[in-house]
């Protein structure tokens, strides 16, 4: 159910959690109908596959961009161009048509064991750096999700804000996110928390920092040969 983004959204809605409305399509006629409906309801819409990882297949749809934009941005596509491309799929891929939320996005990195959160840190990405928070409004939602799905290990839950600033659940990734190592700069070591729990070890924890900014640095090294 976590991997099926449509079923996941329905479960979140059933739990009265802030999910995002979505129409599932598996045929070009269904796609056209869903696009028409969602364009009438929302100022911006997007499409993403029911099954997928690392954002593969996600696009924001717009009537006002040229077909060539797809060669300049892999996340923005002309609506009619997307419909034409989808019509050529054999067999069709199940897709979701959704509102495109234009607010801030955050990633919550979590160490958990049998549905219980051991530690978590939220990351917000900016152009040149990331901010890590040990307290965040999405954490209470994460507790409900981790318990309901009995999550175990290092996972990541993604959220995005609407134009009113309210957070909505995007998805659960049942694996560590690429940037989860940034979180250690808060003083919270997610890997150590998980190992200590599983092996019944006593963990010495430093006093965590509430908010930190983390800047990635790429350094060249001279080969002595």
Question: Predicted regions span which residues?
Answer:
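Active-site nucleotide/adenylate-binding loops and adjacent lid/helix of ATP-dependent enzymes
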Residues: 2-94, 114
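A generic fold-level signal
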Residues: 3, 53, 92, 103, ...
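Short loop/edge segments at beta-strand edges and connector loops
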Residues: 26, 99, 155
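Short, solvent-exposed loop/turn segments at secondary-structure junctions
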Residues: 52, 102, 125, 174-175
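Short hydrophobic/aromatic beta-strand or adjacent loop that forms the aromatic wall/cage
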Residues: 56-58, 105-107, 156
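Phosphate-binding site of ATP-dependent enzymes
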Residues: 70-145, 149, 160-168
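ATP-dependent carboxylate activation and anion-phosphoryl transfer catalytic cores
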Residues: 128-225
């Amino acid at each position: 159910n976590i991997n099926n983004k449509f079923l996941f959204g329905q479960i979140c809605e059933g739990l009265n959690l802030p999910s995002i409305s979505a129409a599932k399509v598996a045929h070009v006629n269904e796609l056209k109908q869903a696009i028409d409906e969602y364009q009438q309801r929302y100022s911006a819409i997007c499409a993403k596959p029911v099954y997928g990882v690392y954002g593969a297949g996600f696009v924001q749809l717009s009537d006002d961009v040229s077909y060539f934009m797809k060669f300049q941005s892999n996340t923005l596509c002309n609506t009619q161009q997307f419909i034409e491309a989808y019509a050529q799929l054999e067999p069709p891929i199940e897709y979701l048509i959704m509102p495109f939320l234009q607010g801030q996005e955050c990633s919550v990195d979590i160490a958990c064991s049998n549905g219980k959160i051991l530690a978590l840190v939220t990351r917000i990405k900016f152009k040149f750096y990331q901010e890590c928070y040990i307290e965040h409004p999405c954490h209470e939602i994460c507790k409900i999700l981790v318990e309901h799905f009995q999550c175990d290990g290092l996972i990541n839950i993604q959220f995005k804000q609407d134009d009113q600033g309210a957070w909505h659940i995007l998805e659960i990734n049942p694996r560590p996110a690429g940037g989860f190592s940034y979180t250690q700069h808060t003083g919270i070591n997610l890997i150590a928390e998980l190992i200590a729990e599983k092996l019944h070890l006593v963990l010495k924890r430093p006093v965590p920092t509430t908010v930190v900014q983390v800047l990635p640095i790429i350094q060249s090294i001279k080969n002595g040969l």
